[in-house]
Every structure is written in C-alpha cells, then in structure tokens.
A protein has these predicted regions:
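Beta-strand-rich solenoidal segments
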Residues: 4-9, 56-153
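N-terminal "first-domain core" detector
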Residues: 2-59
Length: 153
C-alpha cells in the first residue's frame, strides 16, 4: 500500500512546513493540466517484471489516473505469484480520504484476486492464468506465444 498527501488550502488553516513540502514534492496541478484529456488508467510506469527464482512479480513505480484523480507510487512493489491454477487479475484500488482537514490523502493498494471483475475506484494492471510447472513471463519470445493462453502477463 502507498499513500499520497496533498494539502488543503482554506480559510483558517495555518500553513506549516509539512504542507509546503507536500506541495513542492507533489505538484498535482501539473498532472491535472498535462493529463486532463487522458482516460482513467496507467499514465506512466507500473511495468511488470517477473522473478522466476523467488516466484515474485514486481510492479515498478508509476503514475495512474483513477476516477479522474491522480495517484503515484514512488517505490517498486512486489507480489508473490499464486501457486493455485486459476484465472487471476491484478488491480490497483484507490481510496480518497480527508485527514485532519489539512491534507487530501489518496491511498493506492494492489489487489491480486481470482476472476476478472473490476469495481469503482479500481484499474486493471494485468490478467493471467497460471499453470503448475510453468514459468510466469511477461514477454513474447516467438509467434507460438501469441496463441499461449496461460502463464503470460
């Protein structure tokens, strides 16, 4: 899980150092201007890297737009590969809360679950079907991989 804070400026709030640091580090208005005409989804990053030996999927840092709000992840995130043969979906869920009436808090959370349903405040990162004894990959090596139905992100 990761969290973004953005200050709320309104009458009566005292401007403090933390608010200025968040404003400097997270220029939200720039995102809103640059990507206002983009649909919800991944804007940059969130690449998938598989580590076969450790059986881990790494999601790289990135920026996403969910419900016309922006959320960014500053560090890579790792998820264990499921061992049970099923259809899986990896999605990013965003929640928006107001903390102490001083900051907007946007929290992003990765969810790996069976099936293929997406609800409000979520975007799909990838879908895959696992098979026991096969390696999970994220690249196409030849034309036969285009027909491959399982273990490919």
């Amino acid at each position: 899980m990761f969290k973004n804070l953005y200050p709320i400026f309104k009458s009566g709030n005292i401007l403090d150092k933390k608010m200025l640091e968040k404003l400097r580090d997270n220029p939200m208005e720039i995102f809103e201007i640059l990507y206002s005409d983009y649909n919800n989804g991944i804007l940059k990053g969130f690449d998938l890297i598989t580590k076969k030996e450790e059986k881990i999927i790494r999601v790289t840092k990135g920026i996403a737009k969910i419900d016309n709000k922006f959320v960014w992840m500053h560090e890579d995130y790792e998820i264990e590969m499921p061992m049970i043969e099923k259809d899986y979906i990896l999605k990013l869920r965003m929640t928006i809360n107001i903390e102490n009436n001083k900051f907007y808090e946007r929290t992003g959370e990765f969810i790996l679950e069976e099936g293929s349903s997406i609800t409000d405040h979520e975007i799909e990162i990838t879908r895959f079907i696992t098979r026991e004894g096969e390696e999970l990959r994220n690249d196409y090596r030849n034309f036969l991989d285009l027909k491959r139905y399982f273990n490919l992100l």
